Amino acid sequence: MDDIDSLILIGVLIALTAFFVASEFAIVRVRRSRIDQLITEGNKRAILARRVITDLDEYLSASQLGITLTSIGLGVLGEPAFERLLHPLFEPLGLPDSVSHAVSFAVAYGLITFLHVVVGELAPKTVAIQKAEQLTLLIAGPLRLFYLLLFPFIWILNGSARLLCGMFGLKPASEHDGSHSEEELRMLLSESLKNGEINPSEYKYVNKIFEFDNRIAKEIMIPRKEMAAVSTEMTMAEMLEVMLKEKYTRWPVTDGDKDSVLGLVNTKHLFSDLLFMTEEERMKMTIHPYVRPVIEVIETIPVHDLLIKMQRERIHMAILSDEYGGTSGLVTTEDILEEIVGEIRDEFDEDEQPLIQKLGDGHYVMDGKVRIDQVNSLLGASIQEDVDTIGGLILKENIDIEAGESIRIGSYTIKVLKMDGRLIKQIDIKEEAGNTTGITAHHKLPLPEPVMLNSATLSEK
Protein backbone atom coordinates (compact mmCIF):
# COMPACT_ATOMS: atom_id res chain seq x y z
CA MET A 1 0.00 0.00 0.00
CA ASP A 2 1.51 3.33 -1.07
CA ASP A 3 1.48 6.45 1.07
CA ILE A 4 -1.45 8.08 -0.76
CA ASP A 5 -3.65 5.04 -0.16
CA SER A 6 -2.56 5.01 3.48
CA LEU A 7 -3.50 8.67 3.94
CA ILE A 8 -6.91 8.09 2.33
CA LEU A 9 -7.51 5.11 4.61
CA ILE A 10 -6.41 7.14 7.65
CA GLY A 11 -8.91 9.86 6.67
CA VAL A 12 -11.66 7.24 6.36
CA LEU A 13 -10.83 5.76 9.77
CA ILE A 14 -10.86 9.20 11.42
CA ALA A 15 -14.22 9.93 9.76
CA LEU A 16 -15.61 6.60 11.01
CA THR A 17 -14.32 7.33 14.51
CA ALA A 18 -16.07 10.70 14.37
CA PHE A 19 -19.27 8.97 13.19
CA PHE A 20 -19.31 6.46 16.05
CA VAL A 21 -18.40 9.06 18.69
CA ALA A 22 -21.13 11.39 17.43
CA SER A 23 -23.58 8.47 17.37
CA GLU A 24 -22.79 7.52 20.96
CA PHE A 25 -23.35 11.02 22.34
CA ALA A 26 -26.31 11.91 20.11
CA ILE A 27 -28.47 8.88 20.96
CA VAL A 28 -27.83 9.41 24.67
CA ARG A 29 -28.52 13.14 24.52
CA VAL A 30 -31.63 13.20 22.33
CA ARG A 31 -35.02 13.53 24.08
CA ARG A 32 -37.36 10.62 23.48
CA SER A 33 -40.38 12.89 23.79
CA ARG A 34 -39.10 14.96 20.88
CA ILE A 35 -38.58 11.86 18.70
CA ASP A 36 -42.13 10.72 19.54
CA GLN A 37 -43.41 14.14 18.51
CA LEU A 38 -41.59 13.89 15.17
CA ILE A 39 -43.17 10.47 14.59
CA THR A 40 -46.66 11.92 15.12
CA GLU A 41 -45.75 14.66 12.63
CA GLY A 42 -44.98 11.99 10.01
CA ASN A 43 -41.17 12.05 10.04
CA LYS A 44 -40.17 8.60 8.75
CA ARG A 45 -36.55 8.86 9.88
CA ALA A 46 -37.81 9.41 13.43
CA ILE A 47 -39.32 5.89 13.40
CA LEU A 48 -35.88 4.35 12.94
CA ALA A 49 -34.39 6.77 15.47
CA ARG A 50 -37.01 5.68 18.01
CA ARG A 51 -36.00 2.07 17.44
CA VAL A 52 -32.36 2.94 18.11
CA ILE A 53 -32.97 4.83 21.36
CA THR A 54 -35.39 2.15 22.57
CA ASP A 55 -32.56 -0.44 22.47
CA LEU A 56 -30.03 2.09 23.64
CA ASP A 57 -27.66 -0.31 25.41
CA GLU A 58 -27.26 -2.44 22.28
CA TYR A 59 -26.55 0.51 20.02
CA LEU A 60 -24.16 2.06 22.54
CA SER A 61 -22.25 -1.22 22.47
CA ALA A 62 -22.22 -1.04 18.67
CA SER A 63 -20.86 2.52 18.81
CA GLN A 64 -18.17 1.55 21.32
CA LEU A 65 -17.16 -1.42 19.17
CA GLY A 66 -16.92 0.86 16.14
CA ILE A 67 -14.77 3.36 18.06
CA THR A 68 -12.47 0.57 19.25
CA LEU A 69 -12.03 -0.95 15.78
CA THR A 70 -11.33 2.38 14.09
CA SER A 71 -8.94 3.46 16.87
CA ILE A 72 -6.97 0.23 16.54
CA GLY A 73 -6.89 0.71 12.77
CA LEU A 74 -5.51 4.22 13.19
CA GLY A 75 -2.84 2.93 15.54
CA VAL A 76 -1.80 0.19 13.13
CA LEU A 77 -1.83 2.27 9.93
CA GLY A 78 -1.50 5.89 11.00
CA GLU A 79 1.80 6.00 12.83
CA PRO A 80 3.80 3.95 10.26
CA ALA A 81 2.35 5.97 7.36
CA PHE A 82 3.19 9.33 8.92
CA GLU A 83 6.60 8.05 10.03
CA ARG A 84 7.46 7.04 6.44
CA LEU A 85 6.38 10.48 5.19
CA LEU A 86 8.28 12.40 7.88
CA HIS A 87 11.51 10.37 7.98
CA PRO A 88 12.98 11.88 4.75
CA LEU A 89 12.50 15.38 6.18
CA PHE A 90 15.02 14.68 8.95
CA GLU A 91 17.72 13.09 6.73
CA PRO A 92 19.19 16.46 5.55
CA LEU A 93 19.86 17.34 9.18
CA GLY A 94 22.61 14.72 9.26
CA LEU A 95 21.18 12.98 12.29
CA PRO A 96 22.06 9.37 12.97
CA ASP A 97 19.51 7.02 11.45
CA SER A 98 18.36 5.78 14.87
CA VAL A 99 17.81 9.36 16.11
CA SER A 100 16.08 10.39 12.88
CA HIS A 101 13.80 7.37 13.16
CA ALA A 102 12.98 8.11 16.81
CA VAL A 103 12.18 11.79 16.11
CA SER A 104 10.00 10.98 13.10
CA PHE A 105 8.22 8.30 15.15
CA ALA A 106 7.51 10.78 17.99
CA VAL A 107 6.21 13.45 15.61
CA ALA A 108 4.08 10.91 13.71
CA TYR A 109 2.68 9.50 16.95
CA GLY A 110 1.81 13.00 18.21
CA LEU A 111 0.21 13.98 14.90
CA ILE A 112 -1.99 10.90 14.62
CA THR A 113 -2.99 11.28 18.29
CA PHE A 114 -3.92 14.93 17.70
CA LEU A 115 -6.06 14.09 14.67
CA HIS A 116 -7.72 11.19 16.46
CA VAL A 117 -8.57 13.15 19.61
CA VAL A 118 -9.56 16.48 18.05
CA VAL A 119 -11.14 15.47 14.73
CA GLY A 120 -12.27 12.00 15.70
CA GLU A 121 -13.54 12.59 19.26
CA LEU A 122 -13.75 16.10 20.71
CA ALA A 123 -15.28 17.90 17.73
CA PRO A 124 -17.91 15.19 17.01
CA LYS A 125 -18.81 15.04 20.70
CA THR A 126 -19.43 18.80 20.82
CA VAL A 127 -21.53 18.72 17.66
CA ALA A 128 -23.53 15.72 18.93
CA ILE A 129 -24.34 17.40 22.24
CA GLN A 130 -25.49 20.60 20.54
CA LYS A 131 -27.30 18.97 17.59
CA ALA A 132 -28.46 15.70 19.15
CA GLU A 133 -31.85 15.59 17.42
CA GLN A 134 -30.58 16.28 13.90
CA LEU A 135 -27.64 13.88 14.25
CA THR A 136 -29.79 11.07 15.67
CA LEU A 137 -32.11 11.28 12.67
CA LEU A 138 -29.07 11.31 10.36
CA ILE A 139 -27.06 8.45 11.86
CA ALA A 140 -29.90 6.10 12.87
CA GLY A 141 -29.92 4.24 9.52
CA PRO A 142 -26.15 3.67 9.14
CA LEU A 143 -25.80 2.79 12.83
CA ARG A 144 -28.56 0.19 12.60
CA LEU A 145 -26.92 -1.32 9.50
CA PHE A 146 -23.58 -1.57 11.36
CA TYR A 147 -25.38 -3.13 14.34
CA LEU A 148 -27.06 -5.79 12.16
CA LEU A 149 -23.80 -6.63 10.35
CA LEU A 150 -21.84 -7.08 13.58
CA PHE A 151 -24.70 -8.35 15.75
CA PRO A 152 -23.03 -11.71 16.57
CA PHE A 153 -19.87 -9.96 17.80
CA ILE A 154 -21.85 -7.39 19.79
CA TRP A 155 -23.92 -10.17 21.38
CA ILE A 156 -20.77 -12.12 22.31
CA LEU A 157 -19.08 -9.02 23.75
CA ASN A 158 -22.11 -8.03 25.82
CA GLY A 159 -22.53 -11.59 27.06
CA SER A 160 -18.86 -11.82 28.00
CA ALA A 161 -19.07 -8.54 29.90
CA ARG A 162 -22.13 -9.76 31.83
CA LEU A 163 -20.37 -13.04 32.64
CA LEU A 164 -17.28 -11.21 33.88
CA CYS A 165 -19.38 -8.94 36.09
CA GLY A 166 -21.24 -11.97 37.42
CA MET A 167 -17.97 -13.61 38.47
CA PHE A 168 -17.40 -10.67 40.81
CA GLY A 169 -20.98 -10.61 42.04
CA LEU A 170 -21.82 -7.45 40.12
CA LYS A 171 -24.86 -6.68 38.03
CA PRO A 172 -24.19 -5.01 34.68
CA ALA A 173 -25.32 -1.40 34.79
CA SER A 174 -27.86 -0.10 32.33
CA GLU A 175 -26.28 2.75 30.39
CA HIS A 176 -29.58 4.51 29.81
CA ASP A 177 -31.09 4.47 33.26
CA GLY A 178 -33.19 7.62 33.07
CA SER A 179 -34.24 7.65 36.69
CA HIS A 180 -32.88 10.23 39.13
CA SER A 181 -33.05 10.49 42.88
CA GLU A 182 -34.69 13.50 44.49
CA GLU A 183 -31.29 14.97 45.37
CA GLU A 184 -30.09 14.53 41.77
CA LEU A 185 -33.19 16.28 40.48
CA ARG A 186 -32.64 19.13 42.93
CA MET A 187 -29.06 19.47 41.64
CA LEU A 188 -30.29 19.49 38.04
CA LEU A 189 -32.81 22.18 38.92
CA SER A 190 -30.12 24.23 40.63
CA GLU A 191 -27.86 24.01 37.57
CA SER A 192 -30.77 24.88 35.27
CA LEU A 193 -31.49 27.95 37.41
CA LYS A 194 -27.84 29.06 37.28
CA ASN A 195 -27.77 28.64 33.49
CA GLY A 196 -31.03 30.53 33.01
CA GLU A 197 -33.00 27.54 31.70
CA ILE A 198 -35.68 28.03 34.38
CA ASN A 199 -36.68 31.14 36.32
CA PRO A 200 -36.60 31.50 40.14
CA SER A 201 -40.37 31.01 40.44
CA GLU A 202 -40.24 27.68 38.61
CA TYR A 203 -37.30 26.60 40.76
CA LYS A 204 -39.19 27.56 43.93
CA TYR A 205 -42.38 25.74 42.93
CA VAL A 206 -40.67 22.48 41.98
CA ASN A 207 -38.62 22.45 45.19
CA LYS A 208 -41.77 23.06 47.21
CA ILE A 209 -43.41 20.08 45.49
CA PHE A 210 -40.51 17.90 46.67
CA GLU A 211 -41.00 19.20 50.21
CA PHE A 212 -44.77 18.76 49.90
CA ASP A 213 -44.60 14.97 50.23
CA ASN A 214 -42.65 15.29 53.48
CA ARG A 215 -45.28 17.46 55.18
CA ILE A 216 -47.92 16.26 57.61
CA ALA A 217 -51.19 18.06 58.18
CA LYS A 218 -50.21 19.19 61.68
CA GLU A 219 -47.41 21.33 60.21
CA ILE A 220 -49.74 23.45 58.06
CA MET A 221 -52.94 23.45 60.12
CA ILE A 222 -54.71 26.43 61.65
CA PRO A 223 -54.38 25.63 65.38
CA ARG A 224 -57.49 24.96 67.44
CA LYS A 225 -57.07 28.22 69.34
CA GLU A 226 -57.14 30.23 66.09
CA MET A 227 -60.05 28.31 64.55
CA ALA A 228 -63.03 30.49 63.71
CA ALA A 229 -66.21 28.47 64.23
CA VAL A 230 -69.92 28.87 64.88
CA SER A 231 -71.87 26.87 67.43
CA THR A 232 -75.39 25.49 67.48
CA GLU A 233 -75.71 27.20 70.85
CA MET A 234 -75.62 30.59 69.07
CA THR A 235 -78.73 32.22 67.72
CA MET A 236 -78.95 32.60 63.96
CA ALA A 237 -78.43 36.35 64.32
CA GLU A 238 -75.24 35.78 66.34
CA MET A 239 -73.91 33.36 63.73
CA LEU A 240 -74.59 35.78 60.89
CA GLU A 241 -72.90 38.59 62.79
CA VAL A 242 -69.74 36.49 63.28
CA MET A 243 -69.74 35.34 59.65
CA LEU A 244 -70.12 38.87 58.31
CA LYS A 245 -67.28 40.08 60.51
CA GLU A 246 -64.71 37.41 59.56
CA LYS A 247 -65.80 36.90 55.91
CA TYR A 248 -64.72 33.24 55.58
CA THR A 249 -66.47 31.10 52.97
CA ARG A 250 -66.60 27.89 55.01
CA TRP A 251 -67.20 27.62 58.74
CA PRO A 252 -66.91 24.66 61.10
CA VAL A 253 -70.12 24.12 63.05
CA THR A 254 -69.65 22.84 66.59
CA ASP A 255 -72.00 21.51 69.22
CA GLY A 256 -70.84 24.03 71.78
CA ASP A 257 -67.22 22.81 71.91
CA LYS A 258 -64.49 22.63 69.28
CA ASP A 259 -63.92 18.98 70.17
CA SER A 260 -67.41 18.27 68.82
CA VAL A 261 -67.50 19.43 65.19
CA LEU A 262 -70.79 18.57 63.49
CA GLY A 263 -69.78 19.63 59.99
CA LEU A 264 -69.26 22.77 57.96
CA VAL A 265 -71.47 25.43 56.48
CA ASN A 266 -70.83 27.28 53.21
CA THR A 267 -71.83 30.93 53.52
CA LYS A 268 -72.56 31.14 49.78
CA HIS A 269 -75.49 28.78 50.18
CA LEU A 270 -76.59 30.42 53.41
CA PHE A 271 -76.58 34.01 52.16
CA SER A 272 -78.05 33.06 48.77
CA ASP A 273 -81.12 31.65 50.53
CA LEU A 274 -81.30 34.65 52.86
CA LEU A 275 -81.70 36.98 49.88
CA PHE A 276 -84.96 35.33 48.84
CA MET A 277 -86.47 34.65 52.28
CA THR A 278 -89.31 36.59 53.79
CA GLU A 279 -88.87 38.15 57.20
CA GLU A 280 -90.97 35.38 58.72
CA GLU A 281 -88.82 32.66 57.10
CA ARG A 282 -85.68 34.34 58.39
CA MET A 283 -87.03 34.33 61.93
CA LYS A 284 -87.64 30.55 61.72
CA MET A 285 -84.33 29.81 59.99
CA THR A 286 -81.84 27.42 61.64
CA ILE A 287 -78.30 26.39 60.74
CA HIS A 288 -78.95 22.63 60.68
CA PRO A 289 -80.21 22.32 57.05
CA TYR A 290 -77.00 23.97 55.83
CA VAL A 291 -74.54 21.79 57.74
CA ARG A 292 -72.56 19.60 55.35
CA PRO A 293 -70.16 16.74 56.18
CA VAL A 294 -66.58 17.66 57.00
CA ILE A 295 -63.49 15.47 56.72
CA GLU A 296 -62.09 14.35 60.07
CA VAL A 297 -58.57 12.88 60.10
CA ILE A 298 -55.64 12.39 62.45
CA GLU A 299 -53.22 15.34 62.57
CA THR A 300 -50.28 13.20 61.43
CA ILE A 301 -51.81 12.34 58.04
CA PRO A 302 -49.44 13.25 55.16
CA VAL A 303 -50.58 16.41 53.39
CA HIS A 304 -50.46 14.59 50.04
CA ASP A 305 -52.89 11.92 51.28
CA LEU A 306 -55.17 14.56 52.76
CA LEU A 307 -55.29 16.45 49.47
CA ILE A 308 -56.26 13.29 47.60
CA LYS A 309 -59.01 12.62 50.15
CA MET A 310 -60.33 16.18 49.84
CA GLN A 311 -60.33 15.93 46.04
CA ARG A 312 -62.06 12.56 46.10
CA GLU A 313 -64.77 13.65 48.55
CA ARG A 314 -64.98 17.21 47.12
CA ILE A 315 -64.78 18.75 50.58
CA HIS A 316 -62.50 21.77 51.03
CA MET A 317 -62.03 21.60 54.78
CA ALA A 318 -60.68 18.95 57.14
CA ILE A 319 -60.79 18.87 60.93
CA LEU A 320 -57.65 17.40 62.51
CA SER A 321 -57.71 15.44 65.73
CA ASP A 322 -54.89 14.49 68.07
CA GLU A 323 -54.12 11.01 69.37
CA TYR A 324 -56.65 11.48 72.19
CA GLY A 325 -59.52 12.36 69.85
CA GLY A 326 -59.60 16.08 70.60
CA THR A 327 -59.63 18.70 67.85
CA SER A 328 -56.14 20.05 67.20
CA GLY A 329 -56.90 22.32 64.24
CA LEU A 330 -58.21 22.52 60.69
CA VAL A 331 -56.79 22.52 57.17
CA THR A 332 -58.33 23.93 54.00
CA THR A 333 -57.39 23.34 50.39
CA GLU A 334 -55.98 26.89 50.37
CA ASP A 335 -53.58 25.96 53.18
CA ILE A 336 -52.37 23.00 51.12
CA LEU A 337 -52.01 25.04 47.92
CA GLU A 338 -50.02 27.68 49.79
CA GLU A 339 -47.41 25.02 50.57
CA ILE A 340 -46.54 25.09 46.85
CA VAL A 341 -47.27 28.60 45.58
CA GLY A 342 -46.79 30.63 48.76
CA GLU A 343 -49.29 32.74 50.64
CA ILE A 344 -52.56 33.46 48.82
CA ARG A 345 -54.45 36.62 49.71
CA ASP A 346 -57.87 37.73 48.57
CA GLU A 347 -59.60 41.10 48.79
CA PHE A 348 -60.40 40.49 52.47
CA ASP A 349 -56.78 39.80 53.49
CA GLU A 350 -55.46 43.33 53.01
CA ASP A 351 -54.58 43.84 56.68
CA GLU A 352 -53.13 40.38 57.16
CA GLN A 353 -49.49 40.49 58.25
CA PRO A 354 -47.09 38.26 56.31
CA LEU A 355 -45.71 35.43 58.40
CA ILE A 356 -42.10 36.48 57.78
CA GLN A 357 -40.80 40.01 57.23
CA LYS A 358 -37.19 40.81 56.42
CA LEU A 359 -35.59 43.76 58.21
CA GLY A 360 -32.00 43.21 57.06
CA ASP A 361 -29.37 40.54 56.49
CA GLY A 362 -29.97 37.81 59.07
CA HIS A 363 -32.67 39.90 60.75
CA TYR A 364 -36.38 38.99 60.56
CA VAL A 365 -39.67 39.54 62.33
CA MET A 366 -41.85 36.46 62.09
CA ASP A 367 -45.00 34.84 63.38
CA GLY A 368 -44.59 32.43 66.26
CA LYS A 369 -46.14 29.61 64.24
CA VAL A 370 -43.47 29.66 61.52
CA ARG A 371 -42.02 26.16 61.26
CA ILE A 372 -38.49 25.43 62.44
CA ASP A 373 -37.55 23.98 59.04
CA GLN A 374 -38.60 27.27 57.41
CA VAL A 375 -36.41 29.19 59.86
CA ASN A 376 -33.47 26.88 59.14
CA SER A 377 -33.95 27.29 55.39
CA LEU A 378 -34.27 31.06 55.68
CA LEU A 379 -31.25 31.61 57.92
CA GLY A 380 -29.08 28.71 56.78
CA ALA A 381 -29.17 27.54 60.39
CA SER A 382 -29.41 24.06 61.91
CA ILE A 383 -31.77 24.56 64.84
CA GLN A 384 -32.94 21.21 66.17
CA GLU A 385 -36.42 20.28 64.98
CA ASP A 386 -37.77 18.40 68.02
CA VAL A 387 -40.54 21.02 68.15
CA ASP A 388 -42.65 22.18 65.20
CA THR A 389 -42.60 25.98 65.41
CA ILE A 390 -40.27 28.79 66.43
CA GLY A 391 -42.76 29.75 69.14
CA GLY A 392 -42.70 26.21 70.47
CA LEU A 393 -38.90 26.29 70.53
CA ILE A 394 -38.89 29.48 72.61
CA LEU A 395 -41.36 28.03 75.12
CA LYS A 396 -39.31 24.85 75.30
CA GLU A 397 -36.23 26.89 76.20
CA ASN A 398 -38.06 29.13 78.68
CA ILE A 399 -41.59 28.14 79.64
CA ASP A 400 -42.07 31.34 81.67
CA ILE A 401 -40.90 33.75 78.98
CA GLU A 402 -42.81 37.02 78.64
CA ALA A 403 -43.15 39.64 75.90
CA GLY A 404 -39.99 41.72 75.78
CA GLU A 405 -37.71 38.90 76.90
CA SER A 406 -35.23 37.15 74.64
CA ILE A 407 -33.30 33.93 74.39
CA ARG A 408 -30.06 33.27 72.58
CA ILE A 409 -29.53 30.07 70.61
CA GLY A 410 -26.13 29.70 69.00
CA SER A 411 -25.46 32.92 67.11
CA TYR A 412 -29.12 34.01 67.08
CA THR A 413 -30.93 36.30 69.50
CA ILE A 414 -34.68 35.67 69.53
CA LYS A 415 -36.88 38.30 71.16
CA VAL A 416 -40.59 37.84 71.92
CA LEU A 417 -42.55 40.83 70.59
CA LYS A 418 -46.17 39.77 71.14
CA MET A 419 -47.96 37.11 73.18
CA ASP A 420 -51.57 36.06 73.59
CA GLY A 421 -51.73 34.34 76.94
CA ARG A 422 -49.04 31.67 76.67
CA LEU A 423 -49.15 31.72 72.85
CA ILE A 424 -46.21 33.47 71.21
CA LYS A 425 -47.63 35.58 68.39
CA GLN A 426 -44.59 37.41 67.01
CA ILE A 427 -40.83 37.27 67.46
CA ASP A 428 -37.74 39.13 66.30
CA ILE A 429 -34.76 36.96 65.31
CA LYS A 430 -31.33 38.36 64.54
CA GLU A 431 -27.91 36.86 63.98
CA GLU A 432 -25.33 38.27 66.38
CA ALA A 433 -21.73 38.23 65.16
CA GLY A 434 -19.16 36.55 67.37
CA ASN A 435 -21.50 34.26 69.29
CA THR A 436 -21.39 30.69 68.03
CA THR A 437 -21.15 28.86 71.32
CA GLY A 438 -24.45 27.06 70.89
CA ILE A 439 -25.30 27.88 74.54
CA THR A 440 -28.83 29.08 75.19
CA ALA A 441 -29.14 32.16 77.39
CA HIS A 442 -32.16 34.11 78.63
CA HIS A 443 -32.37 37.88 78.94
CA LYS A 444 -34.95 40.37 80.17
CA LEU A 445 -35.11 43.23 77.66
CA PRO A 446 -37.39 46.25 77.47
CA LEU A 447 -40.22 46.09 74.97
CA PRO A 448 -39.05 47.53 71.66
CA GLU A 449 -40.38 50.72 70.18
CA PRO A 450 -42.82 50.15 67.30
CA VAL A 451 -40.94 49.58 64.04
CA MET A 452 -41.94 50.08 60.44
CA LEU A 453 -41.43 46.82 58.59
CA ASN A 454 -40.23 46.99 55.04
CA SER A 455 -41.97 45.28 52.14
CA ALA A 456 -39.41 42.51 51.66
CA THR A 457 -41.30 39.41 52.70
CA LEU A 458 -41.08 35.68 52.43
CA SER A 459 -44.73 34.74 52.29
CA GLU A 460 -44.91 31.13 53.31
CA LYS A 461 -47.34 29.33 55.50
Curated annotation (Swiss-Prot):
The CBS domain sits at 221-280, 290-347
Keywords in alphabetical order: CBS domain, Cell membrane, Membrane, Repeat, Transmembrane, Transmembrane helix
Q: Where is the CNNM transmembrane domain?
A: 1-202
Regions crossing the membrane: 8-28, 103-123, 137-157
Q: Can you say what this protein is called?
A: UPF0053 protein YhdT
The organism encoding this protein is Bacillus subtilis (strain 168)
Report the membrane topology from the UniProt record: Multi-pass membrane protein
Q: Specify where it is mainly localized.
A: membrane
Subcellular location per the Swiss-Prot or TrEMBL entry: Cell membrane
GO cellular component entries: plasma membrane
